[in-house]
Design a protein with these regions (language model features):
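Internal intein/HINT superfamily modules and their associated LAGLIDADG
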Residues: 1-180
């Protein structure tokens, strides 16, 4: 709860000046939602839509090819923003139980293209991706173990881009508890 509130403050302090508008924060038992309303005619909205390929749902957003031409520092800032929202670093993210092999997971639900865009953006700044786990039945339940246990939708999970934490330091997080 403390982390969620701290994260919300961190994210708001970054986004609100960019959009020139206060975010509305709504909390429930299991989620925190931040939203804002602006006219699609406003410049910031036109630019935002252009940069996400006019995607109107998380599953239809793409990185505009122009983003791959921005400076390395701008790419890091973009990736840091993505990681703040959908990146995780937990004790359980250790690779194969190896000491010092912690990983950052960037989780992308239902968008095959954004996974590749993020991996290519990381590659462009020389941050290697350790692995990508796609939310696909061959990756998540290839031997049909969970399926045969009566869980036919077990495989329907987010895609995960996994990066070793020491490599991800070049990008980092704005959110303090994730960075620590």
């Amino acid at each position: 709860s403390v982390y969620v509130k701290a994260s919300t403050v961190d994210i708001r302090s970054i986004i609100e000046p960019l959009i020139g508008h206060d975010l509305t924060v709504t909390q429930s038992k299991h989620s925190t939602k931040m939203s804002f309303t602006k006219s699609n005619d406003e410049y910031v909205m036109r630019e935002l839509m252009r940069l996400i390929g006019n995607g109107t749902h998380h599953s239809t957003m793409r990185m505009n090819p122009e983003l791959f031409g921005i400076t390395a520092d701008e790419k890091k800032a973009l990736l840091k923003g993505i990681a703040d929202v959908t990146g995780y670093i937990r004790k359980s993210n250790i690779a194969f139980g190896q000491e010092g092999a912690h990983r950052v997971y960037i989780e992308i639900p239902g968008n095959w293209y954004m996974v590749i865009d993020i991996a290519n953006m990381l590659k462009a700044i020389d941050v290697p991706v350790q692995t990508i786990d796609f939310g696909h039945p061959n990756f998540r339940d290839g031997k049909l173990v969970k399926y045969n246990e009566g869980k036919p939708n077990f495989w329907k999970k987010e895609h995960q881009v996994k990066i070793f934490a020491n490599e991800f330091l070049a990008v980092g997080f704005n959110i303090q508890h994730k960075q620590e």
